[in-house]
């Protein structure tokens, strides 16, 4: 069967690609059908045939036949793809008469298809694609080869309403292509010319839009015109907006017509966002007229929340657009309206609408409103941060030190506070949630959207609290009271209230905070006793834990309360409801970090530090926790121990702290000494992994002083490492590499990994590099390096590489002497694992380059000490890195290269031979990634490296000849070398283009943003064949701009004494 398929495909391909005979349209339709409706091999064959045909340089000559005779819409779309391809890439090399022919054909086809209203509706997608083709032609032809385009399209629009409607779409697409999407699609100079042409000829387009809006009764045409106008508003000269009847037409004629209200409101929003001072009156008019219309369309007493939930799509869109309009206008022009006393009421009405819209149960709309409330609260606070925040309404007498703007917004801010408290989003720390089925469960996936919403709401509520903390407290206390008495009790209400209470930590005066919090925690603890049922208790517990975790200042100041809270957390650690134990451990660690010192001091009324109580009862506290929760608990206690400053006391605490894990560890080591096979027992290996994880977390918290515990287990741990390595190797030899997937082998590898994590974690926190280098590094290298080298690739631990990287980063010069030994063991064998492709061993890949980066940054002399063959491998691997498809690896590769180049420049002895051997090579490889579209993300770094390299040559830092065979001035050589390199890679470029590009590489090498845009322009040019006519590349203009840039650079340099060699200074300046 596959053989027959191949024959058929070959036959189809031969027939379709034979341009000497007529196109068999039925055959083409069949192949296209195969692509869309076939499966497997059949589909792949069709894809191959169509790709071959599309890439054929003469394929475009078949497009008219395809569009005219094909019965299949997909085939027509395929024909348009061919046409688009030729316009974008080969237009400049087509003879003029053929360009004119294609242009006439496309215009004719659009006129024919769009003149018939029924056809327009039926073939919407097809016409849309034809329009896009025309716009691609315009980007090549207009204004030079088609100066009359704007008057042509405006003239044609007056002949037929249906045609006019489609022409509006074409103008809208052209505007988008030139003003919104031009970056990276057309060169900067060409983009500027197209923008200038659009602005210069806009009056004709504007008159057409005005004519339609004033005279047409054709609703779809008017709608299309408004949509097009919307796209123009962000770039047209402002006179067209503010010195014509446009604003009043939009408001009076279209805003209250259901079909046009959404697009009209979007237009008004776009205008509202303009920031200029000379049109103040027009903005006031815009605001007052829009508000008048709004009150007719949507009376102020409307329940917008209800209207939204019952509304149709376009009604819901209208409410969203309304929020955008109000938010945009008020953020930009609120002070303009505030100044006018006669508009105060209108301003309050606008804020009332904002409040009503803020209550709509739709997150996207709420985010828009929140943006405004945040802006307003922040502005009012920043104007006078230290004004009293007591509420004048509550304190009975008028406070004259409340700033006037604040007074104006006061009544509204009461309502906004209530809104924020009632709608507070879920913070990241809360793990116990109610799911869609109404069950209380542990949340596993973090919702970044919800976290961002929480952060913005938190910030807004903090500002609102600063503006009037009495009111904030009143709202929260009342709402809490209603939870306790049951009138507002629900999980959702309790959650949002507690999340809001937690979010204002630090925004009240300390005394007020204390009074408020004591009430809150007492009420919540009471609620916990009062409510029955595990779910209720879990929700209340999660809220108590969240709030206490947010108020470390309060806890630090009130020891009794802190102790009560921590004991309550220990209670929750026995509560097996989903998520409660996790949250108890997470809250405990937060409190431990923020209040660490209080646990190691003897507090008033206590006989010993609380840490001793914890360590005495540690067994009882953690007996119901899961292993990973125990690890979190150990980390928390570690922060407390880390705060003890008396070394002797601290060492005693560490011994007591690690007693439980050490007992199990010692027992396993003793058994292993008698019978090493115990290290093949699954349960034992699992225990070892868990003990080491505990040590890792403890070390992370205690820091350098953990050395006393590390030293105690260090050599045994490395022996276990070696022993497990041998077990793994033996298993692989006996059963092949698949054995690494088995649970026991995976547990053994966990032990190895955790060993490396413990060592690297401690080294990164240590403070005595010499002691580490002398006592800890030698046994480590002995245990891990040879093992890594000997292992089969699948069994090599990527952590070995990251551990070495951490050691190099931390110890710097202290470890330089060991680098050759480390490299011998890990460099080549890892490189052979990752240089076959870009996918396998992703962790080894990342860590390998992190190690290279560490050596490059901290032990660069070691690079110069390794043999030349190995250094070449290092450089090859850096080049391999920046060509990577994995973004993080490519970025690391570029950073290593840049640092390497800068380091080499400091090494006089090695620099010149390095440049002679590698400079041109590196340049060539950098250009290969610059011109590779899959690497555009790295363009800034490419620009920095290239600019640095060209600058080295220009400033004469490279004294050796880059071309020993024919020694000429390096700058002249480099200009020719790069020009030839680019010409051979892109033979379709004209000499003038290449010459100008190379000139820019020298002129702009001290202005990275300009250098980067210069590269981006070049990337646009290599996509298309330029032909003889390069006028629309505006090379002369670009040349003048580059010359100016060069002169500017020269002037800047002249102003720095000594920057130029005395022989480079012009004669008249020598005197």
UniProtKB/Swiss-Prot annotation:
Residues recorded with modification Phosphoserine: 391, 450, 1031
Effect of residue 590 to A: Enhances Ran binding activity and does not abolish nuclear export complex formation. Enhances Ran binding activity and does not abolish nuclear export complex formation
Result when mutating residue 572 to A: Does not abolish Ran binding activity and partially abolish nuclear export complex formation
Outcome recorded upon mutating residue 481 to Q: Strongly abolishes interaction with Rex and RANBP3, abolishes Rex-mediated mRNA export
Organism field: Homo sapiens
Effect of residue 337 to L: Does not abolish Rex-mediated mRNA export
Record protein name field: Exportin-1
Family: Belongs to the exportin family.
């Amino acid at each position: 069967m596959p053989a027959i398929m191949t024959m058929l495909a070959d036959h189809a391909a031969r027939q379709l690609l034979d341009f000497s005979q007529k196109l068999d349209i039925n055959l083409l339709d069949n192949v296209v059908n195969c692509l869309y409706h076939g499966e497997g091999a059949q589909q792949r064959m069709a894809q191959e045939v169509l790709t071959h045909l599309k890439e054929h340089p003469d394929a475009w000559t078949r497009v008219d036949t395809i569009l005219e005779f094909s019965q299949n819409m997909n085939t027509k779309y395929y024909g348009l793809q061919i046409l688009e391809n030729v316009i974008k890439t080969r237009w400049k090399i087509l003879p003029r008469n053929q360009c004119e022919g294609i242009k006439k054909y496309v215009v004719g086809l659009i006129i024919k298809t769009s003149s018939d209203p029924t056809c327009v509706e039926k073939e919407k997608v097809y016409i849309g694609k034809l329009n896009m083709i025309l716009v691609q032609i315009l980007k090549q032809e207009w204004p030079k080869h088609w100066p009359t385009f704007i008057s042509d399209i405006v003239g044609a629009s007056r002949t037929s309403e249906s045609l006019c409607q489609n022409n509006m779409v074409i103008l809208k697409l052209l505007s988008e292509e030139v003003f919104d999407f031009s970056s990276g699609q057309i060169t900067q100079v060409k983009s500027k010319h197209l923008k200038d042409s659009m602005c210069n000829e806009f009056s004709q387009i504007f008159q057409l839009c005005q004519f339609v809006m004033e005279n047409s009764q054709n609703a779809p045409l008017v709608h299309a015109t408004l949509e097009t106008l919307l796209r123009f508003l962000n770039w047209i000269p402002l006179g067209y907006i503010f010195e014509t009847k446009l604003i009043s037409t939009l408001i009076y004629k279209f805003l209250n017509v259901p079909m046009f209200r959404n697009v009209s409101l979007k237009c008004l929003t776009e205008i509202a966002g303009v920031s200029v001072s000379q049109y103040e009156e027009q903005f006031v008019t815009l605001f007052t007229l829009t508000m008048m219309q709004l009150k007719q369309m949507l009376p102020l007493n409307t329940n917008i929340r209800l209207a939204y939930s019952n509304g149709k799509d376009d009604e819901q869109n209208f409410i969203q657009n309304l929020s955008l309009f109000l938010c945009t206008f008020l953020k930009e022009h609120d002070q303009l309206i505030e100044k006018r006393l006669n508009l105060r009421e209108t301003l309050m009405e606008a804020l009332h609408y904002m409040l009503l819209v803020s209550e709509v149960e739709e997150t996207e709309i709420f985010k828009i409103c929140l943006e405004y409330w945040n802006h307003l609260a922040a502005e009012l606070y920043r104007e006078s941060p230290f004004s009293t925040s007591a509420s004048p309404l509550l304190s009975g007498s008028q406070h004259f030190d409340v700033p006037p703007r604040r007074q104006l917004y006061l009544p509204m801010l009461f309502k906004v506070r209530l809104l924020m408290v009632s709608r507070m989003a879920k913070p990241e720390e809360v793990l116990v949630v109610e799911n869609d089925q109404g069950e209380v469960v542990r949340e596993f996936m973090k919702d970044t959207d919800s976290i961002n919403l929480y952060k913005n709401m938190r910030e807004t509520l903090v500002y609102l609290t600063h503006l009037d903390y009495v009111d904030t407290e009143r709202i929260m206390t009342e709402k809490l009271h209603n939870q306790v008495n049951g009138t507002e009790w629900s999980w959702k209400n309790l959650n949002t209230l507690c999340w809001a209470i937690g979010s204002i930590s630090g925004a009240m005066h300390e005394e007020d905070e204390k009074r408020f919090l004591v009430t809150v925690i007492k009420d919540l603890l009471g609620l916990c006793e009062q409510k029955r049922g595990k779910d209720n208790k879990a929700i209340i517990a999660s809220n108590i834990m969240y709030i206490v975790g947010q108020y470390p200042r309060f806890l630090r100041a009130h020891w009794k309360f802190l102790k009560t809270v921590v004991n309550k957390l220990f209670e929750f650690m026995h509560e097996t409801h989903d998520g409660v134990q996790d949250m108890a451990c997470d809250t405990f660690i937060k409190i431990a970090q923020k209040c660490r010192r209080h646990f190691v001091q003897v507090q008033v009324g206590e006989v010993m530090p609380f840490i001793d109580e914890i360590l005495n009862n540690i067994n009882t506290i953690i007996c119901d926790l899961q292993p990973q929760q125990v690890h979190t608990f150990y980390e928390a206690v570690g922060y407390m121990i880390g705060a003890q400053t008396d070394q002797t006391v601290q060492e005693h605490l560490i011994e007591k702290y690690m007693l439980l894990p050490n007992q199990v560890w010692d027992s396993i080591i003793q058994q292993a000494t008698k019978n090493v096979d115990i290290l093949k027992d699954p349960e034992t290996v699992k225990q070892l992994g868990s003990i080491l994880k505990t040590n890792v977390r403890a070390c992370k918290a205690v820091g350098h002083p953990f050395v006393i515990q590390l030293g105690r287990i260090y050599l045994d741990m490395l022996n276990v490492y070696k022993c497990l390595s041998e077990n793994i190797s033996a298993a692989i030899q006996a059963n092949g590499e698949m054995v690494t997937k088995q649970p026991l082998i995976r547990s053994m590898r966990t032990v190895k990994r955790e060993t490396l994590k413990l060592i690297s974690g401690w080294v990164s926190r240590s403070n005595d590099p010499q002691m580490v280098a002398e006592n800890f590094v030698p046994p480590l290298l002995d245990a891990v390096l040879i093992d890594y080298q000997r292992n089969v690739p699948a069994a090599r631990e990527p952590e070995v590489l990251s551990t070495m990287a951490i050691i190099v980063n931390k110890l710097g010069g202290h470890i330089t002497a060991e680098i050759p030994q480390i490299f011998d063991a890990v460099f080549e064998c890892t490189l052979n694992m990752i240089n076959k492709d870009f996918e396998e061993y992703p962790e080894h890949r990342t860590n390998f380059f992190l190690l290279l980066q560490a050596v490059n940054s901290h032990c660069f002399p070691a690079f110069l000490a390794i043999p030349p063959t190995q250094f070449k491998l290092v450089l090859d691997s850096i080049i391999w890195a920046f060509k990577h498809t994995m973004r993080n690896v490519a970025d690391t590769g570029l950073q290593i290269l840049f640092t390497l180049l800068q380091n080499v420049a400091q090494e006089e002895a090695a620099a010149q031979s390095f440049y002679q051997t590698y400079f041109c090579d590196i340049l060539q490889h950098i250009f290969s990634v610059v011109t590779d579209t899959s690497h555009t993300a790295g363009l800034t770094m490419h620009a920095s490296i290239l600019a640095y390299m060209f600058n080295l040559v220009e400033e004469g830092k490279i004294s050796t000849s880059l071309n020993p065979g024919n020694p000429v001035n390096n700058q002249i050589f480099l200009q020719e070398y790069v020009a030839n390199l680019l010409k051979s890679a892109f033979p379709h470029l004209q000499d003038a283009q290449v010459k100008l590009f190379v000139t820019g590489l020298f002129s702009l090498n001290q202005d990275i943003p300009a250098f980067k845009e210069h590269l981006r322009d070049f990337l646009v040019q290599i996509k298309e064949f330029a032909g003889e006519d390069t006028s629309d590349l505006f090379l002369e203009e670009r040349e003048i701009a580059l010359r100016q840039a060069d002169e500017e650079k020269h002037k800047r340099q002249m102003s720095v004494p000594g920057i130029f060699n005395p022989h480079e200074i012009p004669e008249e300046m020598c005197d």
